[in-house]
Structures are given as structure tokens and as C-alpha cells.
């Protein structure tokens, strides 16, 4: 076979990505603030309408047609899998200044509060960190270790309390975003 070197495919991918960024009409979502942009890509009932030009492909859910899921119920239950991010994944989030968290002295033994301090804002939009509030509320909610096997409770796809019952979540689930092209 005439196998091509990996650089050939990397160059093809770079060319396609450049063309996509210049001419697709898609763009990174910046409608709000750095403290909310990332999480709001995943917790809106419709992510493909309005000012959001980042989502390329999403699984559409619609309560009107009974097309629902149970993301909220799964995140609020000790019996529905207890999802949680791994410590290795959490450690991979950068610091707010762009430096690596794992370059900090003593990072392996830091408390949860210490390890989530001064991190890239997307960490606090991926897991419950100190000061986390549910969507459309102002009351801080601490992580419930009974709901997550790792201690790092995910909040992606997590909407308001009105969707907490089993099979009542209907926010769209992004599958492919412009950020993956960048």
C-alpha cells in the first residue's frame, strides 16, 4: 500500500480547519462572560437557536414531543450511575494564567478548595466548585459526594431544578462544536 506519512494528514486537517474557520459562519460562543460562556453551551434548552453560532451538530430534545433525557436526574441521584470526572481530568485543566496546575508544588495533596482555586474558568463550569449555584438560582450548592463516585460532580448538561425528575430533561446535547476545530 502507498501509506502517506502522518504529516500529510495533519496538513490536510489544518487546511480544512482553516477553511472552516474562515468561511463556515460558525464562531466561538462569546455571548455572555467567561464565567458562563462554556457551561451555557451545554445547559440551554435549545443550543442551536439565537446567538449561538458554535454548535455544529447537536442531539435535539423537545419536551413537547416527549423527546427527553435524564441528565439532571442522573446528577442528583445515588442510584443512577453516580457520574463523576476523574482526578486526572480535573488536574488537566489549566490555571487561570494558562500555566499547568500539575506544575504547582504539592498539587497531589491539595484539598478540593485549594485545587479548584484560580483555575481556568471552564473548570467551575464543568464540576461543582465552591460557590456553585444551580441554573437560575443564587443559592450556593455544595457537591454531594453520595451523587458522584469520584467527588468531582459534573454540571455539564445540568439545567434548572424543574428538570430534576427522571426523564424530564430536554436541553439539547452538543455533539460537535466549533471549538473542536480550533
Protein language model regions, located:
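Conserved, well-structured interaction surfaces
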Residues: 112, 117, 129, 133, ...
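An aromatic- and glycine-enriched ligand-binding surface/loop that stacks and positions planar moieties
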Residues: 1-145
